[in-house]
Amino acid sequence: YVLLLGTDGRPGEDTYRADSIILARIDPTQKQATLISVPRDTKVEYKGETMKINACHTVGGAEAMVEAVNELCGVQISHYAEVSFDGMQALIDSVGGIDINATDDVDDPEHLDIKITAGQQHMDGATALTYARCRYTYADGDYTRMRHQRQVLGALANQILNNFDATKIFGLVNSLSDMLVT
């Protein structure tokens, strides 16, 4: 299993939460990945305290998140990757953007400044990040956001595996080197 973490850290901050928590099971023989989102507000026991699972990151970083998700899901996570908001945006931009069928409109001027219309479109990093972050305008809030996050990851994987221009490989590697922790 691989734990994928999207963090809400901003420059100058020492501690931050995991804004996106996705457990991935990779099956290389079937060439298939299964993604399961863990709601960020899930209550867990960590180091004797009850807290939201996303707060484990503020206590012990990605290692604490691995421990908490292992315990919650009863699995053994062997690797993790962590990316910040800025890092995700740069990664998507480094591969030329992603093609995605947006299942919902995004219009949340109080929290995000990009509007998105539902339907098939090409998204740059800023637009894809907005699509993956929006939750306040949906009745089911975080559940729609988690679905959007999985869509963005799927579109990113598709772009890298099927549509990526190999001449941009150095830009991709450079963007990854600053943001991934394994």
Task: Annotate each predicted stretch with a short phrase.
Residues 1-182:
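Non-catalytic, solvent-exposed segments at the cell envelope interface
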